[in-house]
């Protein structure tokens, strides 16, 4: 660029500037690269350490679960439980513990006294799968789909129930030694009693229970006597043919919302029920609904126990489609033609149209002194429940001939 000294000098300065910028960029790149590599290296080391610790924790917990289950099998607990199984396998790493137990069996005495040790229940399953998240051992899921057998045995009688289901799933949340929440779901559930041959089928069954806010002790501030809400939903129920005397053998649906006060323990024996009753325990039937063909029953009420620990029921019930029920009671000989005619006349006079447009009638449904009544009409006398001998009733008292 002779003849243009300024242009030559500018080009030289531009080249030097570019070289300087490249050197600065290269130096910064090395510094940043070293810092980034160091941070990545530290992160990888921390991640690797956490992974190793978690792996040790997971497999250590797996070994602990196996030892606890084996201990339960080899050494019966003080509660009288004995357990056995054919094979156990724990998988699910890293997100859960999936405990698969082949041919599990649990056996326990219904009573703790020595004179009543001959009364026991036995559960046998084909396969049980328990799933637990590593970060919360208080929440777990149990899958009992397939075949299950439950036997109640004592010196006088025995019951052998067999269930087959497409799905049986239980989700539970525990707090301390209590079940805070329990969710049960079953699909295509078939239950049969081996000795009587009676069989029940339920297309869908849902059961949910959870503790609600506890009552507070004003003097100590300690919470006590927790209440519990219970929700039951059953659909597509097929009853034994013997029950078709009064109702259709098929029940379309049963819905029920209950609130149990004063901490009723799940084991129904003489001591627990007496304590619950004396503490003022009642079951509030907040709502219920049952549909069988054209007959629909719904309402609310209360359930308690009398001095003999027999049920006391008081329900304000609404009936829709009750006339066919009167005809059926007459057909089976439960009421005569004159009584049926009088019942229809009275029911027609007090019936009102419901929100659905169907005619319905409101009548009290009660159980007192074991007598089940609808309005002024007594339907039947219920068998006496002897809680002192467990929850089982003599077979001859409950068979429907």
Predicted regions and their residues:
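Flexible, membrane-facing loop/turn or short amphipathic-helix motifs
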Residues: 105-120, 148-161, 188-200, 236-249, ...
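Short, hydrophobic/aromatic-rich segments at coil-to-beta transitions
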Residues: 180-183, 227-231, 280-287
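Short helix-loop boundary/capping segments
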Residues: 247-255, 259-268, 293, 307-309, ...
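Loop-centered beta-sheet repeat module
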Residues: 188-254
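N-terminal beta-strand/beta-hairpin edge segment
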Residues: 78-218, 288
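N-terminal type II signal-anchor transmembrane helix
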Residues: 28, 32-70
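Extended terminal
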Residues: 7, 14-17, 21-44, 86-87, ...
